[in-house]
Amino acid sequence: MAGKRKARDEEFIFTLSDEETPYINGGDFDEEDDDVAPSINKSKNTKTLKSRVEPSSKKRRNEESTTGHQNKKLKQQEQGQQKGLKGKRAIANGWDAENDSNGSGEDEEEEEDEEGEEGLLDSDFEFDIGGATNIGLVEEFDGWGAEDRDKQGNMGEAKKGVDLDEILCRRRQKKLESQEKKTREAAKSNVDDSFEGLSDDDGHNEDENEDNEMPNFDDDELLAPDAFGMGAEGESDEQGKANADKGSDDESMPDANGADEEDASDSDSVASPVAHPDDLRSDESSDSEEEDPEEVAKRNAFFAPEENPTKSEETSSNSTFQNFNLSRPILRGLAAVGFSAPTPIQRKAIPVGLLGKDLVGGAVTGSGKTAAFIIPILERLLYRPRKVPTSRVAILMPTRELAVQCYNVATKLATYTDITFCQLVGGFSLREQENVLKQRPDVIIATPGRFIDHMRNSASFTVDTLEILVLDEADRMLEDGFADELNEILNTIPKSRQTMLFSATMTDSVDKLIRVGLNRPVRLMVDSKKHTVGTLVQEFVRLRPGREGKRMGYLVLLCNTIYTNRVIVFFRQKKEAHRARIIFGLLGLKAAELHGSMSQEQRINAVEAFRDGKVPFLLATDLASRGLDIKGVESVINYEAPQSHEIYLHRVGRTARAGRSGRACTIAAEPDRKVVKAAVKAGRAQGAKIVSRVVDPAVADEWASKVEEMQAEIEDILKEEKEEKQLAQAEMQVKRGQNLIKHGSEIMARPKRTWFETEREKREAKKRALSELNGPDSVIKKEKRKLSGKEKKKLDDNRLREEGKIWKKGKKERESKGDMRSQGKGKAKKDKVKAKKAAR
């Protein structure tokens, strides 16, 4: 009996019943989970398995462990003898093995003591909701990860730009050396002079230090509403604003609901208020924005009828992504990025996108529009035929940074699928992009220019198989700057496709949308196109007439005292952003610039430096105003108001994203009145918080004077930078010549790259794009001609306002001066007569 029982024990095989199966990732492993299984904590599972083993099996396991240790001891001794080791060393190995066996026995005894606590929950146990632990949850994901950046490929055509920080560092070092030299010379002169006491210069320096102390803006939130742009609701507000403009030039703003008491008194003879021309224009534009019945009829005929779900359906049915019946790899990708619940635009757009319908979507900035079109695209691509790789989706973006960001978000969401991506962006290597296109990626994310370049010049790129077209920031893509390129793409790709358009300021013009080739699109407008986020505070700093030249002083003051961290400053022109970058560097403020004159490597490095917190300020043009999603942007400053209210909405939308709070400050002068009034009117209609920030003009003048003193140094830096650029270009030309000599035949054998426009048409398109961003005045070149009397008087008046009031001669001074001249002439004649007589 004992022999049979022993044989049965040896033949016994451990099995786990259904009840004993450990709960891993919500259930049994599927084929899709094979790559996740190894990452599970094995120690806890083995511990639970040991607690479920029968006592008879434990005895057999102890016997096996002892025999195993004895065999191990014999093997070690044999190995030691074969290698010619000494006997002592072999015995020592045996003792180690025995000690190990004793230790293992003690561990097993401890495990037997723990068997009584089967029902207790392990203190180290953590619930894994959705398998986020095993798939690597990314917190605060914003599409600018370093891992994805490494996979994007080398920038084969990257140009090494001039390092402005190096120039500023050299100049700072020279200045420090000169100051040290002066101090040493001054110390020597003080040693030579046996003068004791306090010098006048020292006292003067102390006074200057006291004057230069910055005020403390403790009450910066207790702000008064401004008459500038604040009177956007009625005629009484307009009158109050007109009366406020006639007041003193003090920077404090009167109340927008009425004028000062002195101006409002009936006894004073006050002229009838006259509206500002910009206010009249803005009123006309607001009237024109009212819906035209003909346009409404066109819209109703063009768009598909909207389905209005009930509130209960909106709240209950689509509260989570699981309710959209998405595939498991997509849900795992959403969990990895940290998306838990869909936003309003995602709740509306995902079901329509899954049905394959054309749609036009609009929502406020930071509401998740990118995921709203990527999620249905990925879900549809999971059911594609896989025998022949084919490019099926094209996503077009207006800027390179936005395309790179969308590429990173899409690849992260598709981590657990076999969907392939490619980004066609300027600044990256053409050859590497062509090699990727040869593999026929499923999704192509591109800017229009590079997309057309490959479409015309790359033999490996075909657009005949495209099934889905997405235009992100569609209102910008439909403007004149991109009109020609977009028409070229739309005329080439197949007409039978799904088209999706998204933007925060989506246009309602049917004439523009017809160009895209939409087929009864579904219109999904979650928010009004003129609205901002509710968590955004909009602030305005007014510059009085004649103080426009002090604008940089106001900006430096705000960046030094109020907005000191995670700030994006927007400029209209590249040269202004670059000049501000130099001024910030000279004042010791760390900043990065972002505009179109920089190389692609410099642009990405600037965004990364700001994102990682290496620099607190990002000085950018409208290149960064659309779509750029950087976590933690606290404030946005408009150096001057943009050309239109739509551009203003995109600029201020870089902060207060995804439910966070933020502030937007605009430094506004008289030319900016129209945009400011439109922003205030839309904000008040929405119920947003709008305030006017009061800035001490004396302190702003001090900073402006500091900037004026640096003008000569700024010009020297610009000159040095220009010389370094010329040297770099000369080196590049030399390398180009060397390559032509070495590989001339190969280079000449390459087919010439073609474009659908001539150089003249390119220049015209560029002018149209500039006029869209900065207005028609930015394109018109002023001809050199003689100024008329009115123009001279206008220039003189502007100069007098900037310089301030100066003394002028009156009638008495002119008359007295004339008398003195006549007296002087008579005296001179008498002196001449006397001299002649004396000579005779």
From Swiss-Prot:
PROSITE patterns: DEAD_ATP_HELICASE, HELICASE_ATP_BIND_1, HELICASE_CTER, Q_MOTIF. Residues 350-524 form the Helicase ATP-binding domain. The keyword Aminoacyl-tRNA synthetase does not apply. A motif (DEAD box) lies at residues 472-475. A motif (Q motif) lies at residues 319-347. Residues 824-840 have a biased composition (Basic residues). Its EC number is 3.6.4.13. Residues 105-127, 193-223, 250-266, 285-294 have a biased composition (Acidic residues). It comes from the Eukaryota. Disulfide bonds: none annotated. Belongs to the DEAD box helicase family. DDX27/DRS1 subfamily. ATP-binding RNA helicase involved in ribosome assembly. This is ATP-dependent RNA helicase DRS1. It comes from Coccidioides immitis (strain RS) (Valley fever fungus).
